[in-house]
C-alpha cells in the first residue's frame, strides 16, 4: 500500500502546530483593544433527533481559527492584556471513555496545540467569573449574544458582540504561510483520503450532459450513456480547511470511433469550442490576479472574453439597429455565464469576506478607490456588465491582498430553462433574448456546461495556483492514457 505524509514547518518555536496563538494575537490587534477577554465555544456534541447517535462533527470555524482544535466539546478564551490563550477540554468521563473512547485530555492538548494553558471545562465558569470581577469595566468579546459562557451571572457582565466577528473575518481572509502550505496544497482526493481528511468540503457535483448546466447539481444519479461531458466539482476538507476544484471533461465512451492520438479527443466540435472559451477565460483571469487588483474588474474581463467568443461562434448576435454596447447593457453574456468568477476560500468553501476598508492598505492597493471609480465609470458607459455577485465580485469589495485565497471558476452553460425563458422574452426591449441566435444555441445544448475552477493564492507580485489537477491537454492525455 502506498503511504503519504505531509510535514509542515512553521517559523517560530511551535513546529508543526497550527498557529492558533498567532491568530489570536492578530484578532486582538484588529480589535485595537489593550484589554478584554475573547471567548469562543467549539462545536458541541449534538445527538440526532430521537436518537442516541451523535450527528457528524464539524468544528466551528471561528473557534478553529484561534486553536486548531478538531475535537468536540471544547472552549477557548484569550486574555488580551495577559496575552494568554486558554483551551478548555471536556472533563474526564469514565463511562464515556468506555463507550466512545477517550476525549481530548489536558496533557495531550498542551502537546498538540499552540495554547498557553489547558483546563477542564468545569473550570470555565469560575475562571470567567474571576476575570470579570477583576476587570469590571472591560468587555468579554463574543461572536453572538447567544454564545455567552455558561454562568449564572451572565447578565452582570459586560458582553460585546458587535466587533469580534468583523475582526476575525478581516484576519481570516488573509492566509498565512501555515495555512497556504499545509491546509490547501495537496488537498485533493487521493492524498487527502489516504491520510485523515474527514471528507468533502461540500456536496460533490458530478453532472453529466444537460445536468452540467445546473450550477449546484447534487443528485448525481443519472447514467452517462449518450452524454458528451461531465462537470466534476469536488473538494476535500483537511483540518477544517476547504478546497474547491472543478474540472469538465469528455466522457471517453462518447468519443466513439476515434483514434486517440492527440486529435479527435472531443465528443463534438461544440464541446471542444466551449471548453476552449472557458479555458481562455480562466487563464487570462488568473494572469490578472495580484495584490491590489480589483476582482470585480477581473470578473468583468472574463465576461468580455465570453462576449467576443460567443459572438464569434454565432451564439450571440447584434441585431440590426443595435450595438455591442446594447448587448453589454442587456447583460446577454449572463445567460451563459450567470455566476461570479470566484469567491474567498478558507475555513468555509465560501469563506468570509472582509468589509470594505478592513484590509490593510498597501502600496499596490492604495489606489483602490480610484480603481473602483474607473470600474464604475466603465459600467455606466455601457462597457461592462454591472451585475454583482458574492464577494469579492462586487464593486465595494476591497482590492485583493497578499495571503488571500480565492477561486477562479469561469463557466459557460446551456441551461434549457434559462434558454427557453430568454426565447420567450426576446421581443421585449433590452431583453437578453434579442441578442441570441437560438438556432445556433440548439447545436450546443448537448454540451450542457463547462466550468474550470482553481484555488489561487494572491501574492505580492502576482499569484500562485494551488491546484495541480490536470486540465486542457494534460487532462486529455490522462483520460486517454497518453501520460
UniProtKB/Swiss-Prot annotation:
Family classification: Belongs to the peptidase M24B family.
MF GO annotations: manganese ion binding; metalloaminopeptidase activity
InterPro entries: Aminopep_P_N (IPR007865), Creatin/AminoP/Spt16_N (IPR029149), Creatinase/aminopeptidase-like (IPR036005), Pept_M24 (IPR000994), Peptidase_M24B_aminopep-P_CS (IPR001131), X-Pro_dipept-like (IPR052433)
Enzyme Commission numbers on file: 3.4.11.9
Protein residues bound to Mn(2+) 2: 233, 244, 453
Cofactor descriptive note: Binds 2 manganese ions per subunit.
Residues reported in the UniProt entry to bind Mn(2+) 1: 244, 409, 453
Keyword Manganese listed: yes
Cofactor(s) it depends on: Mn(2+)
Reactions this protein catalyses: Release of any N-terminal amino acid, including proline, that is linked to proline, even from a dipeptide or tripeptide
Phylogenetic placement of the source organism: Eukaryota, Fungi, Dikarya, Ascomycota, Pezizomycotina
SUPFAM superfamilies, per database record: Creatinase/aminopeptidase (SSF55920), Creatinase/prolidase N-terminal domain (SSF53092)
Protein purpose: Catalyzes the removal of a penultimate prolyl residue from the N-termini of peptides.
Protein name: Probable Xaa-Pro aminopeptidase MCYG_06503
The keyword Protease appears for this protein: yes
Amino acid at each position: 500500500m502506498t503511504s503519504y505524509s505531509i510535514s509542515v514547518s512553521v517559523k517560530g518555536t511551535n513546529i508543526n502546530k497550527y498557529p492558533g496563538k498567532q491568530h489570536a494575537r492578530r484578532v486582538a490587534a484588529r480589535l485595537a483593544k489593550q484589554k478584554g477577554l475573547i471567548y469562543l465555544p467549539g462545536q458541541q456534541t449534538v445527538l440526532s433527533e430521537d436518537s442516541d447517535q451523535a450527528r457528524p462533527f464539524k468544528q466551528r470555524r471561528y473557534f478553529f481559527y484561534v486553536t486548531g482544535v478538531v475535537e468536540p466539546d471544547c472552549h477557548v478564551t484569550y486574555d488580551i492584556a495577559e496575552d494568554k490563550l486558554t483551551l478548555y477540554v471536556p472533563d474526564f468521563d469514565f463511562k464515556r471513555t468506555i463507550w466512545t473512547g477517550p476525549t481530548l485530555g489536558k496533557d495531550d492538548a498542551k502537546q498538540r496545540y499552540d495554547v498557553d494553558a489547558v483546563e477542564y471545562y468545569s473550570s470555565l465558569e469560575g475562571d470567567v467569573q474571576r476575570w470579570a470581577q477583576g476587570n469590571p469595566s472591560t468587555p468579554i468579546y463574543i461572536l453572538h449574544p447567544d454564545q455567552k459562557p455558561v454562568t449564572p451571572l451572565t447578565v452582570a457582565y459586560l458582553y460585546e458582540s458587535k466587533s469580534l466577528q468583523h475582526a476575525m473575518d478581516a484576519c481570516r481572509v488573509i492566509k498565512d504561510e501555515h495555512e497556504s502550505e499545509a491546509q490547501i496544497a495537496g488537498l485533493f482526493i487521493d492524498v487527502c483520503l489516504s491520510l485523515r481528511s474527514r471528507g468533502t468540503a461540500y456536496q460533490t457535483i458530478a453532472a453529466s450532459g444537460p445536468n452540467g448546466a445546473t450550477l449546484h447539481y447534487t443528485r448525481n444519479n443519472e447514467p452517462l450513456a449518450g452524454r458528451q461531458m461531465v462537470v466534476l466539482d469536488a473538494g476535500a476538507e483537511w483540518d477544517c480547511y476547504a478546497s474547491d476544484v472543478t474540472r469538465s471533461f469528455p466522457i471517453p465512451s462518447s468519443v466513439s470511433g476515434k483514434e486517440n492520438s492527440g486529435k479527435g479527443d472531443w465528443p463534438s466540435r461544440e464541446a471542444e469550442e466551449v471548453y476552449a472559451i472557458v479555458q481562455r477565460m480562466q487563464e487570462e483571469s488568473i494572469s490578472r490576479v495580484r495584490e491590489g487588483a480589483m476582482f470585480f474588474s477581473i470578473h468583468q474581463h472574463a465576461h468580455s472574453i465570453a462576449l467576443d467568443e460567443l459572438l464569434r461562434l454565432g451564439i450571440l448576435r447584434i441585431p440590426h439597429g443595435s450595438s455591442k454596447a446594447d448587448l453589454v447593457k442587456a447583460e446577454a453574456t449572463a445567460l451563459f455565464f450567470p455566476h461570479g468568477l470566484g469567491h474567498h476560500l478558507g475555513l468555509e468553501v465560501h469563506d468570509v469576506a472582509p468589509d470594505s476598508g478592513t484590509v490593510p492598505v498597501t502600496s499596490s492597493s492604495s489606489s483602490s478607490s480610484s480603481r473602483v471609480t474607473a470600474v464604475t465609470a466603465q459600467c455606466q458607459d455601457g462597457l461592462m456588465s454591472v451585475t454583482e455577485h458574492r464577494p469579492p465580485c462586487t464593486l465595494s469589495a476591497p482590492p485583493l491582498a497578499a495571503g488571500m485565497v480565492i477561486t477562479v471558476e469561469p463557466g459557460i452553460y446551456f441551461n434549457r430553462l434559462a434558454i427557453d425563458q430568454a426565447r420567450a422574452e426576446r421581443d421585449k426591449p433590452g431583453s437578453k433574448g434579442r441578442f441570441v441566435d437560438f438556432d445556433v444555441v440548439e447545436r450546443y445544448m448537448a454540451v450542457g456546461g463547462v466550468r474550470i475552477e482553481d484555488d489561487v493564492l494572491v501574492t505580492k507580485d502576482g499569484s500562485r495556483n494551488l491546484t495541480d489537477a490536470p486540465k486542457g491537454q494534460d487532462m486529455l492525455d490522462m483520460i486517454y492514457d497518453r501520460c
